[in-house]
Amino acid sequence: MSAPKNGHESFKNLDTAAVQAGRPPVTPDGPINPPIVLSSTMHAGGPYGYMRDWNATLDSLEQAIGALEGGRCTVFSSGMAAANAIFDLFPQGKPVVASQYSYTGVAMRLKELHDLGRIE
């Protein structure tokens, strides 16, 4: 069995991605688990800018879930962000069936999309 791509030689004999996925590369005195990033903003010029958009913690989480599911993963900063991402996939003017007992924010967004003619 080859060593995992994250470089954790000590995990090369484990048959589960749950223990290995999303971990940082092995470096002397480096963390075994990814650090939790608590800052809301980052210095310009790198891959991360604003916490709600993206950060290193979310990147590690996506890698881990994607490895466990055998595909790609996208995480969101809130349930409404996830709901809006799904709503953006709805074809223009098509009917949408939703529960009347949904989260109020979801119901309000669906009503707004209906009033704009985006959904039926």
Regions found by a protein language model. Give the residues of each.
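Conserved N-terminal alpha-helix of the aminotransferase class I/II PLP-enzyme fold
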Residues: P34-L89, Y101-H114
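Short, intrinsically disordered, charge-balanced linker/junction segments flanking boundaries
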Residues: G117-E120
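Short conserved active-site loop signatures built around small residues
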Residues: S2-V37
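Short, structured coil/loop segments at alpha-helix boundaries
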Residues: M1-K5, S10-T16, N55, D59, ...
